[in-house]
Amino acid sequence: MLLARMNPQVQPENNGADTGPEQPLRARKTAELLVVKERNGVQCLLAPRDGDAQPRETWGKKIDFLLSVVGFAVDLANVWRFPYLCYKNGGGAFLIPYTLFLIIAGMPLFYMELALGQYNREGAATVWKICPFFKGVGYAVILIALYVGFYYNVIIAWSLYYLFSSFTLNLPWTDCGHTWNSPNCTDPKLLNGSVLGNHTKYSKYKFTPAAEFYERGVLHLHESSGIHDIGLPQWQLLLCLMVVVIVLYFSLWKGVKTSGKVVWITATLPYFVLFVLLVHGVTLPGASNGINAYLHIDFYRLKEATVWIDAATQIFFSLGAGFGVLIAFASYNKFDNNCYRDALLTSSINCITSFVSGFAIFSILGYMAHEHKVNIEDVATEGAGLVFILYPEAISTLSGSTFWAVVFFVMLLALGLDSSMGGMEAVITGLADDFQVLKRHRKLFTFGVTFSTFLLALFCITKGGIYVLTLLDTFAAGTSILFAVLMEAIGVSWFYGVDRFSNDIQQMMGFRPGLYWRLCWKFVSPAFLLFVVVVSIINFKPLTYDDYIFPPWANWVGWGIALSSMVLVPIYVIYKFLSTQGSLWERLAYGITPENEHHLVAQRDIRQFQLQHWLAI
């Protein structure tokens, strides 16, 4: 992958990717031999590139971009994780650290990635022409996005399987008596607080029809003894996975021109469904108890470090910074697009969606607690157990249960598809911008990316596939993505320079970011990311799935997966340093100087070697 050898002499780039600063707002003449531009008082002569005759494609409409960003950021975690975290960590009090981290870290990082992609008009790898040593960060986030595609599509396939299973008069997770049920299967109507006892929460009870349908009917987990015994792929999930991958391919094969139209459905449909579920949910008996539990305010919980840690990690993963998606999406914007307004709007929509979804979730949980005569805490849970066990079970008791099941799983399907589309686009754009042969064969390359995710996802749809999925979900995009974004923030804010980055934004939109944003980029956001990275390592616990404890070798494999992306950062620095001609001083200078300023190295005029560069804000 690391094929390009840098020449220290000043040569025009010829990678075919159109960049913002070299595409002025006025129409350019293709016959020009030289373009003179000024950046930070330094005039650079830039030879026009071969790709200038074919300018970079842009979104068909501005709304296509906004819906794509919202669709990517608003995913399954908004439904199955945030509401439970809010409930668990003091209810309304949790919104204080959550909002604080949104303002001082989430939004600044979101804004930074959009501006970075829009100005340079490059994917996650080639955007690092601003600081060549950091190109390994781009490769790292591309690999992480690919890893996520291996297992995230499987969760979408589960949703599709549930959707197909919902087209029956009697939902299959309503009662016992099916081939997948165990002798211990218990009618939910017979379960209450006295039957369960004091030590068993309803959400953890494994013998309800809904729980057995998920673990035995869908996953076939009972046929596997652990991660060492995964078995063969299940044909039902195989077909669903094929459908998901085919939909993804035809959504992405022509770039943003097709994906920008698909998100009109996948990004908006969940809001209609969420509204319908919310309106119906609040009318159910016990719903008010669930909502009160969700919104209860316990300020004393703010004294606990875990509350702040949960808020920090949730805001980071919720916004989706660091996967290369925001950079890729923004690279197809018009150069003068107001990405500042876009960042504020889309990040706010994402967080508001998380909060509102809690009402739809906890109204149903309150209803379940009322029906089974247990406390809210006995039914409250997060993750797959919420959306594939508890919520479907609650739906099965409603009048017109088939309709509500179809509506709910259509929402999950839409939430998953546009998020997966974003991850795949990050991989495709990131590599296609780096290797022009891939860009020239976009359709074939898109097929290769989607098909590779299909092949490796086969391990996750085996009888023990949930163990593989849990391993990937924990390690593939955990500490590694936090590390990658930390490096990204340092590369932009310190090596490239906040002042220079602010000037780039001024060229695009006509105004410089305020002091608040510059301080966040240079100090607050890197400190926030460093804090989250350290906490994620300190709080690591050996991997488990319910009562199953993963063997030690599985944890080592997991850390190997995590390190496989992180090591790309130092490996590329070493590669770039060794492959560059010149003295040690010149090699270092070329590695930290933007490519369009390499002529300054010969003049020994390097910003990064001056104290003023590091102190500038």
UniProtKB/Swiss-Prot annotation:
Keywords: Cell membrane, Cell projection, Disease variant, Disulfide bond, Glycoprotein, Lipoprotein, Membrane, Metal-binding, Neurotransmitter transport, Palmitate, Sodium, Symport, Synapse, Synaptosome, Transmembrane, Transmembrane helix, Transport. Dopamine 1 binds at D75, A145, F317. Glycans are attached at N184, N192, N198. It is a multi-pass membrane protein. The keyword Metal-binding applies. Na(+) 1 binds at G71, V74, D418, S419. Pfam families: SNF (PF00209). It is found in: Cell membrane; Cell projection, Axon; Synapse, Synaptosome. Mediates sodium- and chloride-dependent transport of norepinephrine (also known as noradrenaline), the primary signaling neurotransmitter in the autonomic sympathetic nervous system. Is responsible for norepinephrine re-uptake and clearance from the synaptic cleft, thus playing a crucial role in norepinephrine inactivation and homeostasis. Can also mediate sodium- and chloride-dependent transport of dopamine. This is Sodium-dependent noradrenaline transporter. It comes from Homo sapiens (Human). The lineage of its organism: Eukaryota, Metazoa, Chordata, Craniata, Vertebrata. The gene is SLC6A2.
